């Protein structure tokens, strides 16, 4: 084929290729319109269809305007800004036939907006969702922060793998009583509990779990994603039942503890390692820290001090638990 013919054929393919989907259904009768967000953007042409066998005497209205917007079974609108979103309803006489609700997902300079959630600055990457698991049962908790109080809705979806996804069930997002203060501002904390349906605690993970949060504020839509292996988000509960036993003719004491009840069993397979530290008066920490695999240690315990113990998976460098403590006095 002549080079000029190749160029013409390639151009034909480009022109005939279907455009990227700029509007898609989030849930029944709710649609997301994806917009390039800059003053010169043309917006998106959206065709709404009235869900009725009727053909005649159909009119359209929206919750943004009291005027009749058009007539007929379909309505074509140009969506350029939030004033063009909202609920569109088709009527016949005084009867409502159906409605469609339009949300806007903004893209500025090629980047999807992240206005609804607060970035959690704990790594080099932008993180909006944080997830933790107390053990290898496949159950985990995710949370996020927002400064927004009203007109807010979250929906959470999760699966492991994409080609043949394994089911992960998530509950409803709930507002925590805990307020989180960041940069002198209080943020609301939302949490969700998820459970992998066919989790095998001892199995090696080959595919990550993906969590997607659909966030809606008024007429704005955003989504946030986190992808991880359970082993990477493990954070045990603190050790339990800390006890001190004085040692004869010694300044040392023996501190002992037990595995947390929520940790995976058997402990001979799902083993923990422990960090032990003496904290002095006024919460001053001694620099030396013991690392032990057994559930006891000998330390010097001064008056007014306390001993702290935390736990971590012995064979994988995931997160340490919070501290458990016992007073020396």
UniProtKB/Swiss-Prot annotation:
Gene3D superfamilies for this protein = Immunoglobulins (2.60.40.10)
Q: Where is the Fibronectin type-III domain?
A: 238-329
What subcellular compartments does it reside in? Secreted
Keywords of this entry: Cytokine, Disulfide bond, Glycoprotein, Immunoglobulin domain, Secreted, Signal
Q: Which domain of life is it from?
A: Eukaryota
Q: According to the UniProt record, which cysteines are disulfide-bonded?
A: 50-90
What job does the chain carry out?
Cytokine that can act as a growth factor for activated T and NK cells, enhance the lytic activity of NK/lymphokine-activated killer cells, and stimulate the production of IFN-gamma by resting PBMC.
Family recorded in the similarity comment: Belongs to the IL-12B family.
On subunit structure and binding partners, the annotation says: Heterodimer with IL12A; disulfide-linked. The heterodimer is known as interleukin IL-12. Heterodimer with IL23A; disulfide-linked. The heterodimer is known as interleukin IL-23. Also secreted as a monomer. Interacts with NBR1; this interaction promotes IL-12 secretion.
Q: What is this protein called?
A: Interleukin-12 subunit beta
Q: From which source organism is this entry? A: Felis catus
User: Gene encoding this chain?
Assistant: IL12B
């Amino acid at each position: 084929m002549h080079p000029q013919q190749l160029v013409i054929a390639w151009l034909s393919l480009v022109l005939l290729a279907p455009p990227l989907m700029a509007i898609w259904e989030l849930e029944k009768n709710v649609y997301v319109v994806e917009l390039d967000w800059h003053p010169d953007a043309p917006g998106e042409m959206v065709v709404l269809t009235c869900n009725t066998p009727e053909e005649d005497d159909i009119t359209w209205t929206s919750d943004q305007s009291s005027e009749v917007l058009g007539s007929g079974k379909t309505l074509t609108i140009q969506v350029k800004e939030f004033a063009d979103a909202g609920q569109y309803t088709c009527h016949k006489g005084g009867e409502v036939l159906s409605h469609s609700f339009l949300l806007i997902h903004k893209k500025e300079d090629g980047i999807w907006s992240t206005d609804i959630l607060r970035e959690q600055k704990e790594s080099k990457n932008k993180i909006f969702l944080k997830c933790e698991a107390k053990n290898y049962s496949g159950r985990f908790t995710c949370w996020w922060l927002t400064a927004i109080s009203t007109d807010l809705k979250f929906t959470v979806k999760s699966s492991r793998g994409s080609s043949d996804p394994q089911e992960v069930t998530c509950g409803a997002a709930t507002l925590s009583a805990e307020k989180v203060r960041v940069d002198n501002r209080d943020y609301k904390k939302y949490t969700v509990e998820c459970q992998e349906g066919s989790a095998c605690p001892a199995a090696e993970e080959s595919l990550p779990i993906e969590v997607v949060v659909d966030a809606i504020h008024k007429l704005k839509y955003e989504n946030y994603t986190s992808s991880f292996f359970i082993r990477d988000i493990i954070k045990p509960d603190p050790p339990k039942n800390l006890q001190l036993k004085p040692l004869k003719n010694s300044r040392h004491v023996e501190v002992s503890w037990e595995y947390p009840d929520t940790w995976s069993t058997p402990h001979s397979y799902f083993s923990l390692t422990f960090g032990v530290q003496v904290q002095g008066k006024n919460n001053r920490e001694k620099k030396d820290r013991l690392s032990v695999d057994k559930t006891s240690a000998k330390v010097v315990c001064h008056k007014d001090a306390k001993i702290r113990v935390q736990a971590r998976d012995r064979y994988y460098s995931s997160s340490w638990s919070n501290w458990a403590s016992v007073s020396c006095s």
